Design a protein with these regions (language model features):
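Conserved AMP-binding/adenylate-forming core of the ANL superfamily
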Residues: 9-67, 84-89, 175-178
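Conserved pre-ATP/AMP-binding loop-to-beta segment of ANL
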Residues: 9-11, 140-162, 169, 195-201
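Conserved AMP-binding A3 loop
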Residues: 24-28, 158-184
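Conserved structural elements of the adenylate-forming
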Residues: 31-36, 154, 173-194, 202-205
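Conserved ATP-dependent adenylate/AMP-binding module captured primarily in the ANL superfamily
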Residues: 50, 81-113, 183-203
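Conserved coil-to-alpha-helix start sites within the AMP-binding
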Residues: 56-67, 82-86, 105, 206-219
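Structured binding elements
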Residues: 73
Length: 219
């Protein structure tokens, strides 16, 4: 939001389509899309404090959902694409996940198979999850989003990130909004000139389920 105010016309995201075409988004455009997505999530019934998991590769959709969820006080729970069925089941149960967004139908089916009796909404990008969110935004206003955003405290949990689980079940680490603000400010103190330069281009290939990739996205 800060950058959207200071540099609304600066390109902050470049995404490449399956046919190789590149689409650029400015800070102002990204903010508007995040707000609209947040409206849709509220329309779908996502409440403050709800845990919402994302099982998908690094993508614009991941960024969009994450920022929208954080802006309305929900908690993002990343799931690695490489996680096993038992690890996914553990994460869903341990974090009390209420909704999951996946990249593919196959991933959605895997989630449903490990928690068949679990009250859980599952949507995949390849089956129109983003369009579903957009439709749900119809009766929600930006003022509703602003009200939810104003109620978010720096001490509120922003995300629960799970370890790889190499020595047992994955262990969840809760990070607050203040945690991310502190690390982002630290990064900007060292790399501020690079981060704010319109000439800077960064290729993010890390899985966004990793905390370092999240930090890179935020700064």
């Amino acid at each position: 939001a800060d950058r959207a105010i200071k540099f609304p016309h600066q390109v902050v995201v470049e995404q490449r389509s399956s046919v190789g075409a590149t689409r650029s988004l400015t800070a102002g455009e990204l903010q508007r899309q995040v707000e609209y997505t947040a409206c849709g999530l509220i329309g779908l019934g996502v409440k403050s404090g709800h845990t919402v998991a994302i099982l998908a590769p690094t993508s614009y959709e991941w960024l969009l959902l994450d920022l929208a969820l954080l802006s309305i006080g929900a908690i993002t729970v990343p799931i690695y694409e490489s996680d096993s069925a038992s690890q996914i089941e553990h994460i869903l149960t341990d974090a009390h996940v209420t909704r999951v967004f996946t990249a593919t139908t196959q991933q959605a089916e895997l989630v449903r198979s490990v928690r068949p009796s679990f009250t859980l909404a599952v949507d995949s990008f390849d089956q129109g999850a983003i369009r579903k969110i957009a439709r749900a935004a119809t009766d929600v206003t930006i003022k509703d989003v602003e009200k939810r955003r104003a109620a978010v405290s720096s001490s509120d949990i922003a995300t629960i990130i799970y370890t790889s689980g190499t020595t047992g079940n994955p262990k969840g680490v809760a990070l607050t909004h203040a945690n991310f603000v502190a690390t982002s400010e630290g990064a900007r103190q060292v790399l501020g000139d690079v981060i704010d330069s319109p000439e800077t281009r960064l290729l993010l290939f890390l899985p966004v389920a990793h905390v370092l990739a999240r930090l890179v996205m935020y700064v």
